[in-house]
Amino acid sequence: MDKQQEFVIRTLEERDIRFVRLWFTDVLGFLKSVAVAPAELEQAFDEGIGFDGSAIEGFARVYESDMIAKPDPSTFQVLPWRAEAPGTARMFCDILMPDGSPSFADPRYVLKRALARTSDLGFTFYTHPEIEFFLLKDKPVDGSVPTPADNSGYFDHTPQNIGMDFRRQAITMLESMGISVEFSHHEGAPGQQEIDLRYADALSTADNVMTFRLVMKQVALEQGLQATFMPKPFSEYPGSGMHTHLSLFEGDRNAFYESGAEYQLSKVGRSFIAGLLRHAAEISAVTNQWVNSYKRIWGGTERTAGAGGEAPSYICWGHNNRSALVRVPMYKPGKTGSARVEVRSIDSGANPYLTYAVLLAAGLKGIEEGYELPPGAEDDVWALSDAERRALGIEPLPQNLGEALALMERSDLVAETLGEHVFDFFLRNKRQEWEEYRSQVTAFELRKSLPVL
């Protein structure tokens, strides 16, 4: 055993931990778990735990279903809601084939593969997500309209703000697991919260996002609430995004920073943004993977909701412009390490492993191909007419999942990044979701048409 594995075994004994949950995600980003006893963990480190891959969305067909979950000891943490003895801990797993080779179906491996290519180019990829979600009073039944847990608004600090106690307990849990939080506050809509995680390497951040979602749901359950990461659960309120700040480092140097350049943004940073823009439409099915995702992007309320409700609809960048798809935040003098770009289209229901992989691939393509960055958007992009946007070369994002899938299907970049297995399954699964949605007769249609037609 190596030192990390020895630390895990020793901690289990010292803290009387009786269960270890081994976590991984399916292709769509749903968390999976298998529990093992501490006595089995040494063998799990050596050989992994076998399971039926055909039972996991997108993993394997029934006639080739044997797969192995091998725990990554660097991700070991004690679960804070099982802190009383005997306790429970968790580790994320890498998914392997029976011969020990990585499974191409594993979203974590998709990101690892992209990060390995990044490392070969001399870069380290860092991400920092701002995660929005709603707290609901109770679980809606049979598609009924949900009820927000409070009526507070952006940055509100009021006695009836249920979110304050919720966020305090949730952040305490996160930090006890080594997940650092930068900020938290009430967002713009009733019941809507935002918690921002501190910068970390992209793989750690993706693991942290998955942990974050479970912690939020666990704390909500304990408080008699429901936490949802659905992109847009309310027609009348802004949706929930996962705006993510990205940066590349070469060793200790921020590759996006250049003293004296416009916005202190280096050529590497400019080409990275150009890559994000050029490939934005074709990666949208990954960054915004649900039918409901496009209600957030094109829902209308985003444009008038004020603070916290600015979901981008058009492909452009801007300096400190929150109507743009990619924002270059204001540079803080003396803080060269803080140079970064913010991608604002991602929603809270995205699979973070696949999302970070395609964002990275798009940005690196811009660097490798020397893409030129178009002029930035200086105005409120939503306030422009279609003709004005066309004159500026500003194109729209896909308007629905069907459009996004058609663009993804033709994308060599997405196919290469996800790999054939994940790419094919993702398209099949999402086409089915789109067709099921298109065939529904909605409450809107019945309300508008049934009485008069």
Swiss-Prot record:
An example Gene Ontology molecular-function term: glutamate-cysteine ligase activity
Reaction equation(s) it catalyzes: putrescine + L-glutamate + ATP = gamma-L-glutamylputrescine + ADP + phosphate + H(+); spermine + L-glutamate + ATP = gamma-L-glutamylspermine + ADP + phosphate + H(+); spermidine + L-glutamate + ATP = gamma-L-glutamylspermidine + ADP + phosphate + H(+); cadaverine + L-glutamate + ATP = gamma-L-glutamylcadaverine + ADP + phosphate + H(+)
Domain GS beta-grasp: 15-100
Enzyme class: ligase
Family matches, as NCBIfam families: GlnA
Family: Belongs to the glutamine synthetase family.
Record-given protein name: Gamma-glutamylpolyamine synthetase GlnA2
Encoding gene per record: glnA2
